[in-house]
A protein has these predicted regions:
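Sequence/structural signature of beta-propeller domains
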Residues: 1-165
Length: 165
């Protein structure tokens, strides 16, 4: 899940079909998600604690053919320190960097992808260090050794002038 400005949130629907769904307050409009457009670190999400809130689906993005082939399911979402949206697929054992999502829904497209290789568990959670290294949480039989810190960084912070090849 990714928090968006205005009390909106973006969730990944894992399968049948895999999709991204934006939820927000009733009568609000869908927002586009561009690089740097998620709720900033430390910024308050404008939803008050202790109150019941109603959210409605505002937009749906389905994967294009390349993204669907690269990521067989959508396990987790995260915003990298570069401001881009990233997706983790457990079935494909892949991290994908996604293109901007247009307002109102439509198609989600792949910008880049990284295969995770053999891991000692099922990749279910995604986070990033401030340097852009991916941390993958594994669903394992035992509750230890279930985090993997990947090298090299896949999401270098903005302003560093680095590019991925």
């Amino acid at each position: 899940m990714v928090l968006l400005p205005g009390g909106h949130l973006l969730v990944a629907k894992e399968k049948k079909p895999a999709a991204f769904i934006e939820f927000g307050p009733p009568h609000s409009r869908s927002r586009r998600l561009v690089r740097g457009g998620a709720l900033a670190d430390g910024e308050r999400w404008p939803i008050k604690k202790g109150h019941h809130h109603r959210f409605v689906a505002l937009a749906i993005w389905l994967p294009d053919k390349i993204l669907a082939k690269t990521c067989a399911d959508f396990s987790d979402l995260e915003i990298g320190p570069d401001g881009c949206l990233y997706l983790l697929s457990d079935k494909s054992s892949t991290i994908a960097r996604l293109d901007d999502l247009p307002a109102g829904g439509g198609t989600a497209a792949l910008l880049d992808a990284w295969r995770l290789g053999d891991l000692d568990g099922k990749p279910e959670g995604l986070a990033f260090t401030v340097q852009g290294r991916a941390i993958v949480g594994l669903d394992t039989r035992k509750p230890r050794r279930n985090l993997v810190l990947l090298e090299p960084p896949v999401a270098p912070p903005r302003g560093r002038g680095q590019s991925l090849s």
